């Protein structure tokens, strides 16, 4: 199964190298959508072997995700995992997310940090995350 990892990135020059180096162990097919960065995000990602698609100006998270989906389709991906460039997602969760797809039990899998009771997140932080998520949706 050709698994592609898609990373939307905006001014992630400080983070992108470490993320890409760790993700190379999971998939050799990594797409980085540089969403109008003014730093070296694209250059670093290219040097590390990622497929880089660049927006000339910042179009927002939604546009970056759409670009990643289109590129993944173009390169005939069987599965696409989106992954944040800032290191918030856990690389070790990728295999777990892919299991239902590999076993033909699901066409789409959505992960949530709120489903696991082991990870206690304060109400204050949950409200903050939900607020920022909604603001991002409105502005994208």
Labelled PLM ranges:
Residues 55-74, 91-140:
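Acceptor/aglycone-binding surface of glycosyltransferases and processive sugar-polymer synthases
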Residues 14-18, 39-43, 63:
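Residue-level preference for short helical/loop micro-motifs built around acidic side chains
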Residues 34-42, 87:
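A conserved acidic beta->alpha catalytic loop
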Residues 26, 48-49:
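Short, structured coil segments at secondary-structure junctions
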Residues 6-26:
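Short, well-formed alpha-helical segments that are part of the catalytic scaffolds
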Residues 2-4:
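Cell-envelope/extracellular polymer assembly enzymes that use nucleotide-activated donors
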Residues 77-88:
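Short beta-strand-to-loop acidic/aromatic patch adjacent to the donor-nucleotide binding site
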Residues 9, 33-35, 55:
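Conserved sequence signature across two-component system core domains
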């Amino acid at each position: 199964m050709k698994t592609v990892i898609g990373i939307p990135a905006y001014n992630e020059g400080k983070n992108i190298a470490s993320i890409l180096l760790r993700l190379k162990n999971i998939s050799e097919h990594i797409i980085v959508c540089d969403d109008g960065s003014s730093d070296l995000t694209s250059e670093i990602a290219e040097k590390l072997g990622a497929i880089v698609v660049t927006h000339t100006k910042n179009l927002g998270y939604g546009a970056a995700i759409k670009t990643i989906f289109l590129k993944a389709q173009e390169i005939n991906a069987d599965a696409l995992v989106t992954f944040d460039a800032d290191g918030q997602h856990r690389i070790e969760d990728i295999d777990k997310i892919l299991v239902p797809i590999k076993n033909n039990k699901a066409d789409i899998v959505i992960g949530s940090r709120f489903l696991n009771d082991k990870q206690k997140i304060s109400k204050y932080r949950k409200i903050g995350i939900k607020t920022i998520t909604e603001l991002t949706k409105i502005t994208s």
